[in-house]
């Protein structure tokens, strides 16, 4: 006779983790199929699944798509007066990474941590270190909230722009025709600041995306530039069986229709053998021209799209949700109203940490899933280069051994210089496995600004949302404990603290023996007058009162009952 899970939970000795200390690893999906969790999320509570299109449903191939964007932007700059020599540059995917900051004063690309501390500094193709860095950043620190000076290149669309900025700075710094200055460069009596150069690049990028031929060239060769995944129709059809599915993209309808038609262009439907369905049938609501992040605030006027011409119909749409109708503009409130959903009912899936994830989380309370295509490469290095991580751990052990028997009375000063040099060398080798700017998420032991934003705003993240295919819709994505150093480096073994050695040991806030505590309180209050407050002492909770990030709101459950 089999034992139920509820019976097994009564006895800790029968728990799987106690039967096998490595049990948890056995239940995990393959790394490349995993969805990673920052905040617990119960999938069965999700009533609506929302999608961005660019770099989410439609993943653009790298480096082909970035190369196209780079070439078109360079051509635009040359057409407005920049040197012809720039046409010789070609996009190099090994240099840029997302999350870099461009300093418009000094023309530097910076990699920083969550607090603005410098991790990497590059002026053009030249990596700056030590005293040279401190001349411009005395504390190796920047004020991230100075958005007039510092621009964060956070999106996948920013990658060509990031590399182009490095190319321009390097060219104007080293070309003999120009005189390099601290905040720009001179050509005779003409001065160009890095701020002006940056603005020219921004304007050129916007022109390429909105007025140029980027979309036209993409559509002309979809097979070259867009990833097509046969599992997409299957996942969306399964989502539609358990909830509602909507698309909210900044792209216009004509471009959206061509991209989505290609993504769903299979001879079959969701499964082999089923009949083909148009892409629109996989969504309950389709919304284009969203203008995110404005979409998550006041939004714009909601209008209806004429799908035959791609033009907008006159007037504001005020009716109920109609299947087969494509809408333009609107806001996140509009989506909630049309779908009859509230914030936490919605899981929004996108790639833009600011436009998709941060704003939907902060302004609407939507649950968030961040798509990070670079995660596949990050995981590859993490697993394939494990020897480097193991060597760093070994070097830490060497350091600990040198200091093992020393305390504040010791005059001995171990020579750790060789170990420090080796740590730096191994850390550098590890960083270079990711690319010239290192990992998207860290530099050595320190997490990047991008990593901190992922942890702060994305409830879930993965290399692709297709990974949801490998989980049931009843799944509880449970967040792992985020350990502080005193937790991650101290074993779970009982240690008797000597109160004579450590006066802090008396700061015990737990009531170990409630009967003894009650007796002491009784002794303390015997002589107090009968006129006293209703409650002299708090009582230790006998039921769960703390929020443990399990995504199990008891009030909601009671309402449903």
Curated annotation (Swiss-Prot):
The keyword Nucleotide-binding applies. It is found in: Cytoplasm, Cytosol. ATP binds at residues 144, 154, 453, 456. Widely expressed. Residues 550-561 have a biased composition (Acidic residues). One of its GO terms (biological process) is amide catabolic process. Mg(2+) binds at residues 52, 54, 351. Its EC number is 3.1.3.5, 3.1.3.99, 2.7.1.77. Pfam families: 5_nucleotid (PF05761). Adenosine 2 binds at residue 436. It is linked to Spastic paraplegia 45, autosomal recessive: A form of spastic paraplegia, a neurodegenerative disorder characterized by a slow, gradual, progressive weakness and spasticity of the lower limbs. Rate of progression and the severity of symptoms are quite variable. Initial symptoms may include difficulty with balance, weakness and stiffness in the legs, muscle spasms, and dragging the toes when walking. In some forms of the disorder, bladder symptoms (such as incontinence) may appear, or the weakness and stiffness may spread to other parts of the body. Broad specificity cytosolic 5'-nucleotidase that catalyzes the dephosphorylation of 6-hydroxypurine nucleoside 5'-monophosphates. In addition, possesses a phosphotransferase activity by which it can transfer a phosphate from a donor nucleoside monophosphate to an acceptor nucleoside, preferably inosine, deoxyinosine and guanosine. Has the highest activities for IMP and GMP followed by dIMP, dGMP and XMP. Could also catalyze the transfer of phosphates from pyrimidine monophosphates but with lower efficiency. This is Cytosolic purine 5'-nucleotidase. It comes from Homo sapiens. The gene is NT5C2.
């Amino acid at each position: 006779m089999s034992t139920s899970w509820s019976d097994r939970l009564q006895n800790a000795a029968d728990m799987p983790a106690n039967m096998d200390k490595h049990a948890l690893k056995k239940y995990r999906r393959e790394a490349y199929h995993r969805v990673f969790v920052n905040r617990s999320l119960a999938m069965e509570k999700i009533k609506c699944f929302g999608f961005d299109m660019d770099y989410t449903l439609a993943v653009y191939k790298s480096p082909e798509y970035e190369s196209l964007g780079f070439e078109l932007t360079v051509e635009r700059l040359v057409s407005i007066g920049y040197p012809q020599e720039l046409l010789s540059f070609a996009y190099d995917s090994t240099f840029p990474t997302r999350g870099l900051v461009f300093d418009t004063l000094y023309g530097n690309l910076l990699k920083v941590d969550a607090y603005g501390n410098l991790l990497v500094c590059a002026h053009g193709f030249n990596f700056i270190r030590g005293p040279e860095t401190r001349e411009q950043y005395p504390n190796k620190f920047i004020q991230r909230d100075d958005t007039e000076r510092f621009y964060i290149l956070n999106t996948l669309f920013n990658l060509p722009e990031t590399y182009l900025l490095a190319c321009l700075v390097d060219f104007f710094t080293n070309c003999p025709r120009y005189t390099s200055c601290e905040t720009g460069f001179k050509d005779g009596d003409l001065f160009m600041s890095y701020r002006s150069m940056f603005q020219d690049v921004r304007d050129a990028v916007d022109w390429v995306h909105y007025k140029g031929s980027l979309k036209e060239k993409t559509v002309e060769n979809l097979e070259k530039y867009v990833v097509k995944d046969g599992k997409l129709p299957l996942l969306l059809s399964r989502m539609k069986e358990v909830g509602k599915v909507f698309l909210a993209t900044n792209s216009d309808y004509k471009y959206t229709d061509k991209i989505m038609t290609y993504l769903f262009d299979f001879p079959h439907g969701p499964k082999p053998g089923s009949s083909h369905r148009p892409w629109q049938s996989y969504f309950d609501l389709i919304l284009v021209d969203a203008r995110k992040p404005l979409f998550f605030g006041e939004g714009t006027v909601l209008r209806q799209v004429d799908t035959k011409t791609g033009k907008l119909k006159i007037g504001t749409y005020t009716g109920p949700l109609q299947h087969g109708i494509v809408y333009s503009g609107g806001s996140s409130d509009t989506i909630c109203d049309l779908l009859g959903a509230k914030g936490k009912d919605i899981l929004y899936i996108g790639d833009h940490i600011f436009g998709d994830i941060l704003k939907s989380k902060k302004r609407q309370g939507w649950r968030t899933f961040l798509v990070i295509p670079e995660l596949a490469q990050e995981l590859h290095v993490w697993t394939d280069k494990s020897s480097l991580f193991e060597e760093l751990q070994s070097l830490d052990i060497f350091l600990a051994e040198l200091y093992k028997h020393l305390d504040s009375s010791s005059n001995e000063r171990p020579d750790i210089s060789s170990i420090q040099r080796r740590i730096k060398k191994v850390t550098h080798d590890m960083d270079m496995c990711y690319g010239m700017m290192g990992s998207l998420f860290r530099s050595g032991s320190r997490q990047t600004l991008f990593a901190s934003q992922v942890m702060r705003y994305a409830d879930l993240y993965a290399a692709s949302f297709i990974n949801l295919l490998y989980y049931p819709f009843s799944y509880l994505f449970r967040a792992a404990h985020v350990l502080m150093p005193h937790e991650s480096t101290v074993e779970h073994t009982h240690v008797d603290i000597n109160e004579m050695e450590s006066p802090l040991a008396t700061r015990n806030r737990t009531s170990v023996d409630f009967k003894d505590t009650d007796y002491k309180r009784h002794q303390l209050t015997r002589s107090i007058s009968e006129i006293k407050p209703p409650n002299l002492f708090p009582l230790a909770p006998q039921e769960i009162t703390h929020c443990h990030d399990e995504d199990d709101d008891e009030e909601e459950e009671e309402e449903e009952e």
